[in-house]
């Protein structure tokens, strides 16, 4: 099962499409730079995408909307 759950994540982010976009960008950053917001042992997930979702859930990643 996915941790954190999609229902919990949608309380933080407005839409599932925005969530996918944010998580994909952050997971690529983690993969390329090997820089994490938390200690390695504090993550539940082993892969970058799951870790990016954990960071979103914990509020470590902020979403700033641009006005068009």
Where on the chain are the PLM-derived regions?
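Polar low-complexity intrinsically disordered regions
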Residues: 1-68
């Amino acid at each position: 099962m996915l941790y954190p759950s999609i229902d919990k994540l949608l309380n933080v982010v407005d839409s599932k499409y925005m969530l996918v976009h944010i998580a994909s960008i952050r997971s690529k950053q983690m993969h390329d730079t090997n820089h994490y917001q938390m200690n390695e042992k504090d993550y539940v997930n082993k892969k970058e995408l799951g870790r990016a979702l954990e960071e979103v859930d914990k509020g470590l990643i902020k979403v700033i909307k641009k006005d068009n």
